[in-house]
Amino acid sequence: MRMLSGQHVLDIGSGTGTLALLIKEKHPGVDVVGIDPDTQILEIASRKARRVRADIRFDLGYADRLPYSDSSFDRVVSSLVFHHLAPETKVVALREAWRVLRPGGELHIADVGRPRSALMRVAVIPFRLFDGFGATEHNLAGRLPDLIMETGFDDLAETGRVMLGIVCLYRAVKPRVTSGNRRTSHN
């Protein structure tokens, strides 16, 4: 993921700050904000950032109610969060990501995806045991990319797979100009 100095990045479901810290380490000139609903986890993230002197802000909040102004981020990232959300909450969270992204901004999601082989279906079983069968079902059915496009994003691409192919890396772009028939966060 290419980022330019001065860009603003939001990490939805930042947890203990691992992804936010990695982004800041690789791109020290970007402004990184993490958001998570767990205060104890956010305390851990803040301690980790202070320990390495990384200027990262961690806010308390939810993916489906982002406390940020419209068009305030150049990138929105999320790692292993969406499979935890109910289908209707996924839709609202994606609309919120769309809302806070600037036109031309990018959404990057790493999350459980549809298995492509019998081996991948077996490999995902421990993941499902840990996170719950119900929590992962929607993503394993391949619905997340459809929801991303239905939200109004363009240029959706699966840019790779990790963890034995279980986790898909998705990138999509908020259009620079929205047409009247395109779904937005207000539809």
Which role fits each region the language model picked out?
Residues 1-5:
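Conserved alpha-helix/loop element of class I SAM-dependent methyltransferases that forms part
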Residues 75-88:
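A short SAM/SAH-binding and catalytic strip from SAM-dependent methyltransferases
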Residues 91-103:
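A short glycine-rich, Lys/Arg-flanked "PGG" loop and its adjoining helix->strand segment in the class I
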Residues 169-187:
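C-terminal lobe and adjacent flexible extensions of AdoMet/dcAdoMet transferase-like proteins
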